[in-house]
Amino acid sequence: MYQPDFPPVPFRLGLYPVVDSVQWIERLLDAGVRTLQLRIKDRRNEEVEADVVAAIALGRRYNARLFINDYWRLAIKHQAYGVHLGQEDLQATDLNAIRAAGLRLGVSTHDDMEIDVALAARPSYIALGHVFPTQTKQMPSAPQGLEQLARHVERLADYPTVAIGGISLARAPAVIATGVGSIAVVSAITQAADWRLATAQLLEIAGVGDE
């Protein structure tokens, strides 16, 4: 049963772009996306704070679900919709502070053991990856593939789930067919020849998410 320790999210989050700039956040919100993540890596808090503030303000303006990757202290300080953490960040993060601030929490997983760890934290949603080979970040694990993804989705049938990793426009329908509630994409939009068209097509496949 879905009883998170953090505020809940819609069962289906729909299309979920993960981008590294406020410019992309604004573009995608304007294009109709309503679930997004700002993922800026390897910079100090003071270097990213202005971007986090601007992204959160945009999320509020569009009534969107904006998650901040990793910078949980800034997310709390500026009252983001939510925070997304990788497995390696869970132990070093004050989950009680995130919970007390009323922020949603998403957690990355790559196998059954990591799903167990995520479930113990009782987050708002669980991300399942990486589904396909990806060039976006170095991954220590092998791609799961659609069969493994479907098995994890079935195991987490009551939980909001997000598939991530190497999901292209061509692969998106098969990913959604597993029953996963959301697809997180990066290069499928940011490296598309026509990002507006790619976003519109992905929104048709994955939707904007439940209210």
UniProtKB/Swiss-Prot annotation:
Q: Which domain of life is it from?
A: Bacteria
Organism, scientific name: Shigella sonnei (strain Ss046)
Record-stated family: Belongs to the thiamine-phosphate synthase family.
**What GO MF annotations does this protein's record show?**
magnesium ion binding; thiamine-phosphate diphosphorylase activity
Q: In which pathway does it act?
A: Cofactor biosynthesis; thiamine diphosphate biosynthesis; thiamine phosphate from 4-amino-2-methyl-5-diphosphomethylpyrimidine and 4-methyl-5-(2-phosphoethyl)-thiazole: step 1/1
Q: What does this protein do?
A: Condenses 4-methyl-5-(beta-hydroxyethyl)thiazole monophosphate (THZ-P) and 2-methyl-4-amino-5-hydroxymethyl pyrimidine pyrophosphate (HMP-PP) to form thiamine monophosphate (TMP).
**Binding-site residues for Mg(2+), renumbered to this chain:** 70, 89
Q: Where does 2-[(2R,5Z)-2-carboxy-4-methylthiazol-5(2H)-ylidene]ethyl phosphate bind?
A: 134-136, 166, 186-187
Q: How is the cofactor bound?
A: Binds 1 Mg(2+) ion per subunit.
Instruction: Name the cofactor(s).
Output: Mg(2+)
Please provide one cellular component term from the Gene Ontology annotations of this protein.
cytoplasm
Q: Name one GO biological process term.
A: thiamine biosynthetic process
Q: Which UniProt keywords apply?
A: Magnesium, Metal-binding, Thiamine biosynthesis, Transferase
Q: What is its EC number?
A: 2.5.1.3
Enzymatic reactions: 2-[(2R,5Z)-2-carboxy-4-methylthiazol-5(2H)-ylidene]ethyl phosphate + 4-amino-2-methyl-5-(diphosphooxymethyl)pyrimidine + 2 H(+) = thiamine phosphate + CO2 + diphosphate; 2-(2-carboxy-4-methylthiazol-5-yl)ethyl phosphate + 4-amino-2-methyl-5-(diphosphooxymethyl)pyrimidine + 2 H(+) = thiamine phosphate + CO2 + diphosphate; 4-methyl-5-(2-phosphooxyethyl)-thiazole + 4-amino-2-methyl-5-(diphosphooxymethyl)pyrimidine + H(+) = thiamine phosphate + diphosphate
Q: Which positions bind 4-amino-2-methyl-5-(diphosphooxymethyl)pyrimidine?
A: 37-41, 69, 108, 137
Q: A Pfam family this protein belongs to?
A: TMP-TENI
> What name does this protein carry?
Thiamine-phosphate synthase
